[in-house]
Amino acid sequence: MNRIETAFKNTKPFIGYLTGGDGGFDYSVACAHALIRGGVDILEIGFPFSDPVADGPIIQKAHTRALEEKTDSTTILEIAKALRETSNIPLVLFSYYNPLLQKGPQYLHQLKAAGFDAVLIVDLPIPQHANESEPFFQALIEAKLFPIVLATPSTREERLLQIRKLAKGFLYYVSQKGTTGIRSKLSDDFSTQIARLRCYFQIPIVAGFGIANRASAAAALKHADGIVVGSAFVEKLEKKISPEELTTFAQSIDPRQ
């Protein structure tokens, strides 16, 4: 059983996101460990990219900081290896399509060997029949990496049916329109949208984009099978808070405690 499947067996996972290399290698690894101590059950590691169009200003700046630290594909592998020395937490690579397309299928096998369990491509086209992304899904399967796929409030039925054939581990529901960022509350149709998705999917449905405090996390977990917190953590890294402070902050968001 994949580590991601195991994470959903007895709880609704708290998923955290950090941009790999933000603040440098050592700080990035220390902050990842801090989130694990703070109760995060699954960790998403962002592959820094020069044009992160799906992200809001907070995470865009994190991509810039990571690139300024010379973070590259090898750095991402080394971060995973460092975490695997002491932790069995499921790891998801959160990336744009272009960096992985340039690296080729062999890099997916390197990700698996380093300790990653899944890959989420934020801008990957979903194949209708045969198009440029279909070989990539096959390459993920061959590398034994789960493809994590996004759905939004505007995703139409025909696309959901295609996603259902491809997604493994969990479905990532983008609960807010627009880019990543901190929101004060969930959208008014959140519960309705989750119910709609359950008509199509048997895998867990996780909500992300905008969840930044205990109240919104608790509200999301009433309907979703897990939550993702990203921008709220990344904003703390921009301020260079200590790993100990990050652990405390993560605990303050987790409504299960």
UniProtKB/Swiss-Prot annotation:
Function: The alpha subunit is responsible for the aldol cleavage of indoleglycerol phosphate to indole and glyceraldehyde 3-phosphate.
Listed Pfam families: Trp_syntA
Reaction catalyzed: (1S,2R)-1-C-(indol-3-yl)glycerol 3-phosphate + L-serine = D-glyceraldehyde 3-phosphate + L-tryptophan + H2O
Keywords, sorted A to Z: Amino-acid biosynthesis, Aromatic amino acid biosynthesis, Lyase, Tryptophan biosynthesis
CDD domains hit by this protein: Tryptophan_synthase_alpha
Listed EC numbers: 4.2.1.20
Database matches in Gene3D superfamilies: Aldolase class I
Active site: E44, D55
Homology family: Belongs to the TrpA family.
UniProt cross-references to InterPro entries, sorted A to Z: Aldolase_TIM, RibuloseP-bd_barrel, Trp_synthase_alpha_AS, Trp_synthase_suA
Gene Ontology cellular-component annotations: cytosol
Keyword presence, Amino-acid biosynthesis: yes
PANTHER family per the UniProt record, alphabetical: TRYPTOPHAN SYNTHASE ALPHA CHAIN, CHLOROPLASTIC (PTHR43406:SF1), TRYPTOPHAN SYNTHASE, ALPHA CHAIN (PTHR43406)
Coiled-coil regions, chain positions: none
Any one GO molecular function term: tryptophan synthase activity
Subunit organization: Tetramer of two alpha and two beta chains.
Pathway: Amino-acid biosynthesis; L-tryptophan biosynthesis; L-tryptophan from chorismate: step 5/5
Superkingdom, taxonomy of origin: Bacteria
Name of this protein: Tryptophan synthase alpha chain
SUPFAM superfamilies xref list: Ribulose-phoshate binding barrel
Keyword Repeat assigned: no
